[in-house]
A protein has these predicted regions:
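Acidic, Ser/Thr- and proline-rich intrinsically disordered linker/docking segments
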Residues: 364-431
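Anionic N-terminal interaction surfaces
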Residues: 282-342
Length: 431
């Protein structure tokens, strides 16, 4: 008989509400005692959430950064929560034990996964509570992306109160393009989003839309008023070119370079620097958008036009990574590289031709089944699930965000269900 794999072990677990003793010990000593103070997090309440104390309920939040557990759970202590966390994180050695000990729900992002839904429903039935970040992945741009498909249906099915947090300053503390934290300030608003009676009277689509509207936040716009200084030791823009790859002046793709507090185009010299308030300050004679988020959306508009051209394709050599069947990933790796080949996106979907484990290997995912990708850490690589198996791509160029945007916009152009925010679509239609 073959040895049972880590994947089989993980998906064979029957989860239960987390141990109150362990949760409160970690919550009070480590999170409240150390991390909340370290990140200068402050909590305000727009509703009386104490009336729900001890009941089963769900907390949702905008997914500002990789540190969001520090900014959500403390708002509701002494209540305890099971978190919903990306499936792949359970295979990383520095996280594997704590995630299992805390009865964390493993979720395969952006794909249907009945196991995760069953475990969430079981935890709620047994009197537990869940913290869920419905975007599925931490913010890339500094603002939200639409919540993952099915979020409204899930909340309606659970049928318990839905409370929320809205995090301001979380992205600027831990931006997607850089793994070094920048300490400044984080403001967290907590309140009540839905009562069970409200959920019962709403359609899943209405719930989903209200989730998107209530949780939307733009950290760059917030800091225009808040004026919080974030300390990055002179490296505010390090790796920012991986996120902002398009030059807003000459239109060059993958022509941006960054380092220290500077970002500029190798092709035309257009550039500037990012100060400790995240203000984009153009060099003399240069042209830059108002904020990095505005730049990001302009870049998306460029990619949207590109993918709608007849015969569009995007192709690149990539290395292929998978999760280990036995044991865990060490040195904070996110996958084991087991192959390589050519990845291609077109109007039909995503194609791969190459090798895996020394053997020829190929796959195809129809574009309507591929709304977006995940990113485990920063903007250096991306992943999806192929026939249920985590598959990570390491591109030769700094092109991860190009792949993300091109796939999302192709999915939308071909009638996929994961569309952009309605208010952004309306703005685009108005030109």
């Amino acid at each position: 008989m073959d040895k049972i794999t880590e994947q089989q072990k993980l998906e064979g677990r029957k989860l239960r509400p987390v141990s109150p003793f362990i949760y409160r010990l970690l919550g009070n000593v480590v999170v409240n005692g150390v991390l909340v103070k370290k990140y200068n997090a402050h909590f305000t309440y727009v509703d009386d959430v104490s009336r729900y104390r001890g009941q089963s309920y769900v907390v949702v939040s905008n997914h500002a950064s990789r540190m969001d557990y520090v900014f959500t759970a403390p708002a509701f202590l002494p209540d305890t929560f099971n978190f919903v966390v990306g499936y792949n994180e359970f295979f990383r050695s520095h996280l594997a034990m704590i995630l299992r000990m805390m009865q964390t729900v493993p979720k395969k992002n952006f794909v249907h996964q009945p196991y995760a839904i069953r475990q969430m429903m079981k935890i709620i039935r047994e009197g537990g509570r869940i913290i869920l970040l419905p975007e599925g992945m931490s913010s890339i741009s500094g603002a939200n992306q639409p919540c993952a498909l099915g979020s409204g249906h899930l909340l309606k099915s659970l049928g318990v109160p839905v409370l929320y947090t809205k995090i301001a300053g979380g992205y600027l503390t831990a931006p997607k393009y850089n793994l070094e934290d920048r300490i400044g300030r984080v403001d967290v608003e907590a309140g009540v989003l839905f009562t069970p009676e409200q959920l019962e009277g709403m359609t899943p689509r209405e719930i989903q839309r209200q989730l998107d509207e209530k949780l939307y936040h733009d950290d760059y716009e917030w800091n225009k008023t808040a004026r919080v200084r974030f300390d990055a030791a002179g490296r505010m823009a390090d790796n920012m070119h991986q996120l902002l790859f398009w030059c807003p002046r000459c239109g060059g793709e993958l022509t941006m370079t960054s380092g220290g507090d500077a970002i500029r185009c190798r092709k035309c010299g257009n550039g500037g620097h990012l100060n400790e308030y995240y203000d984009l300050i153009p060099d003399d004679g240069s042209t830059l958008p108002d904020t990095p988020r505005v730049w990001f959306d302009m870049q998306r508009g460029h990619v949207r036009s590109m993918v709608r051209q007849e015969g569009f394709t995007l192709s690149e050599r990539v290395q292929l990574g998978v999760l280990p069947q036995h044991g865990y990933l060490k040195e904070q790796k996110t996958s084991e590289i087991t192959g390589d080949g050519t990845l291609t996106l077109d109007a039909g979907g995503l194609h791969f031709e190459g090798r895996k484990n020394g053997e020829p290997y190929s796959f195809f995912i129809p574009i309507k089944k591929l709304p977006t990708y995940g990113m485990c850490t920063d903007v250096s690589r991306f992943y999806t699930f192929v026939d249920g198996e985590f598959t990570e791509f390491y591109p030769e160029r700094d092109s991860t965000e190009l792949w993300m945007m091109a796939t999302e916009e192709m999915h939308r152009a071909q009638g996929g269900l994961w569309q952009d925010f309605p208010w952004k679509e309306q703005a685009e239609a108005r030109g």
